[in-house]
Structures are given as structure tokens and as C-alpha cells.
């Protein structure tokens, strides 16, 4: 097959991919590459970005190989994808410059064909971590989910959902999918105008599903006379979903990072939501901190969206799986247990602990819950499930609801 793009395009892609070491998010690394090559126009950058992310999603066995093999893989597979119109990008023979690469020489030998085909056929994205997967999560489930570029889900902020949808359509943006109070658009759409004015906020459909508490027992405590603590709030995405459903909730948010809590305050103000109580705390040492700024002794609901490997979101940053060290699973699992051990004393009798991860690994999910229940006889499992995932083409969000019975 004749290449859709000139050799220099594949050469530049292969060089960028080979030199990436996983130390920073790939989209930031890519920005630095673009900055170094100012002669690449906006269409060039779009093509490079599409090719690189196609590689991370599909090149399961060749990502750590030589630049030659990476280049040849792109020529074989990315060209086919563009030819089959699986990628919505413009094609041209004028990409980048006409200079020849100084790092890579063109080869398309039978040996390269054999290497690329063999590696591509013997790997799937989660094969190397299959032994760590949660119950009922298999590589057969994860593979088609991983290789498909995710949509971006958003909900209405300070306007109605109908109003938001109307604005997007008027701007020529196609609504790809709807579910409940959420809309999905292509990942290529620039949503900054709607996010920056508070008309919308971005949150994956699975996270929104995990925070849909209308039919959950903890909904009884989401009002002004009860106390809810989002103990690992980050920038407040889950809390925003909560207050959208229950606007009078007496909410407290904490995180170890004070700067991200400043972001949380700004988001709540922009969206016109009730201001939560906010404090900074390192939950690894929470119980030992006599100077804690925690304003309440007990809470009726504690939401623990704990730090994790993020393996249930890897298709958003597909490079992560190519550099993943399985030893970090245990590191995160131990940290998660430490956090839960330190917040359980602040849970009121009869109250609920909502444990969330965006991981597909058992050690971070059901194994941790078993340890929590084994060490706390006064806790009782109410439910556990994965929210969203393949059914909604969203992230894999694990949710466990636990009640403190005495």
C-alpha cells in the first residue's frame, strides 16, 4: 500500500515515540516537541497527535522496540486506519518538512514485516497485568474498550441541560451521545468556552454514574442537617455531581494539596454551587494530627475517592500502560487502606462510607474492601460494583458502599 503520508512524517513520529520515556504525560511531552518544531502547522500537529495516540492504543508489542520497527509499524497500521477512515484527520503529502530524518533510515524488509506482525498479534493492552484484574474484568473486555478513543462527557453547570445542548449545536458541535443529564462530544472539540464561563463541567459518564445517589441509601443524609465529607476531593468533580443532585448538602472537602483546593473553590463559585467547608489534611497521618482543621467530629457520609493506579482510565492516557510497573499496585493499595483506616473513626454510626477507585485491579478494589471489613467488625458491606465502563463507553469506576452499624 502507498503511504498516505510521506516518509518524513513517519520518521518524525517514530523519533518522538521512541524518545518518550514515560516520565511526563505524553500530551505535555508532545507539546514540547511541537514547540521545538515551529514549522509544523496546526494540521501537522493534528496529524502527529493522531498518529502517536493511535500507536499507543494499538502497538501493544512494539512500543519499546527500535525506531525502525516503530516507523514500520506506523507505515503498516496507521496508513491502513486512515485509508479505512477510522481516523477523522485530513490527509496530505505535504506534512511537516521535506528534509530527511537524520535518526532513522527507511526499511521495509520481510524481517521487519515479520517482527511487526508477530509482536502485534501476540499482545493485548492488559495482558501483562491480567493476573491482577478484578473479578469479572478480563482482557477480552478491556481490549476493545482501550483501543477506542473515548468521548468527552459534560454536564450543565449554571444553565439548563437543554440550554447547553442548544449552545453546542448552534456552535456546530455534534452531540455524539446522551445519558441522563450528560452529553458526549468528540475529544477533538474545544469545550473551553463553556467550561470557563461555568455553563458546563467535564466529567466522565462513569464518574457521574458512580455519583448518582438518588436511589442509594446514602441519599438520606445528603441535606443541610447531615454532614458529608469528600475526604480526597481533588478539584471537586465528585462533590460537584453531589451538589447538583442535592443542593443543600452540608459538604466538607479536604485534600493534601492546598493549591487544588483553591481550584475547587473557584469551580464551585463559577458553577453557582453552595460553598463547602474546606481544609487541608494528609490522611496518612490524620488521626495523629492533633492540630487538624477538620471542623466536624463525625460525618453521616464519607466519600473516599482514593488515589489509585488509574488503570480504569488508561485509554485516556494510553501511554501509561506501556510504562506501567505492577509493583505500584501494592503501593497504592497500602495507601488506600491507610486512608480508610484513618477516616473510619469519623464516620457516624449508621452512616455510609463510599469507596471509589478508577482502577481495574483487585488489590485496590475488592481485596481492600475485604481487609477493611475484616479489621472493622462494625462495618457492613452494602454493595459493590463497577459503574459505567464498557456499557457506557466510559471509565471503569469501582464503587463500594459500606455502612457503620455500631
Where do the model's predicted regions map?
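S-adenosylmethionine
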Residues: 1-406
Amino acid at each position: 500500500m502507498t503511504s498516505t503520508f510521506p516518509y518524513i512524517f513517519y520518521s518524525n513520529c517514530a523519533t518522538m515515540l521512541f524518545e518518550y520515556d514515560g516520565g511526563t504525560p505524553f500530551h505535555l511531552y508532545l507539546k514540547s516537541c511541537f514547540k521545538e518544531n515551529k514549522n509544523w502547522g496546526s494540521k501537522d500537529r493534528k496529524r502527529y497527535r493522531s498518529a502517536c495516540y493511535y500507536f499507543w492504543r494499538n502497538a501493544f508489542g512494539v512500543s519499546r522496540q527500535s525506531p525502525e520497527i516503530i516507523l514500520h509499524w506506523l507505515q503498516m497500521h496507521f496508513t491502513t486506519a486512515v485509508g479505512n477512515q477510522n481516523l477523522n484527520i485530513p490527509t496530505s503529502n505535504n506534512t511537516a518538512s521535506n528534509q530527511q530524518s537524520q535518526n532513522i533510515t527507511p526499511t521495509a524488509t520481510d524481517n521487519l514485516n515479520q517482527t511487526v506482525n508477530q509482536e502485534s498479534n501476540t499482545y493485548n493492552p492488559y495482558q501483562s497485568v491480567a493476573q491482577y484484574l478484578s473479578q469479572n474484568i478480563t482482557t477480552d473486555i478491556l481490549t476493545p474498550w482501550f483501543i477506542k478513543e473515548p468521548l468527552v462527557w459534560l454536564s450543565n453547570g449554571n444553565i439548563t441541560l437543554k440550554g447547553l445542548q442548544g449552545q453546542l449545536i448552534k456552535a456546530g458541535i455534534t452531540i455524539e451521545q446522551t445519558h441522563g443529564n450528560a452529553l458526549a462530544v468528540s475529544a477533538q472539540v474545544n469545550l473551553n468556552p463553556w467550561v470557563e464561563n461555568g455553563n458546563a463541567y467535564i466529567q466522565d459518564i462513569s464518574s457521574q454514574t458512580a455519583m448518582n445517589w438518588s436511589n442509594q441509601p446514602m441519599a438520606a443524609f445528603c441535606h443541610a442537617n447531615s454532614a458529608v465529607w469528600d475526604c480526597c476531593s481533588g478539584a471537586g468533580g465528585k462533590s460537584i455531581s453531589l451538589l447538583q443532585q442535592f443542593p443543600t448538602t452540608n459538604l466538607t472537602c479536604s485534600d493534601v494539596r492546598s493549591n487544588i483546593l483553591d481550584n475547587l473553590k473557584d469551580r464551585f463559585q463559577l458553577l453557582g454551587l453552595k460553598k463547602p467547608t474546606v481544609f487541608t489534611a494528609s490522611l496518612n497521618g490524620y488521626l495523629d494530627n492533633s492540630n487538624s482543621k477538620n471542623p466536624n467530629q463525625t460525618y453521616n457520609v464519607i466519600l473516599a475517592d482514593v488515589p489509585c493506579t488509574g488503570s480504569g482510565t488508561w485509554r485516556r492516557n494510553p501511554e501509561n500502560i506501556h510504562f506501567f510497573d505492577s509493583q505500584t499496585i501494592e503501593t497504592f493499595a497500602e495507601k488506600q487502606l491507610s486512608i480508610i483506616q484513618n477516616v473510619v473513626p469519623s464516620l457516624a454510626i449508621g452512616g455510609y462510607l463510599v469507596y471509589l477507585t478508577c482502577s481495574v485491579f483487585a488489590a485496590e478494589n475488592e481485596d481492600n474492601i475485604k481487609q477493611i471489613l475484616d479489621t472493622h467488625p462494625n462495618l457492613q458491606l452494602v454493595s459493590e460494583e463497577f459503574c459505567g465502563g464498557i456499557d457506557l463507553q466510559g471509565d471503569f469506576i469501582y464503587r463500594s458502599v459500606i455502612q457503620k452499624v455500631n
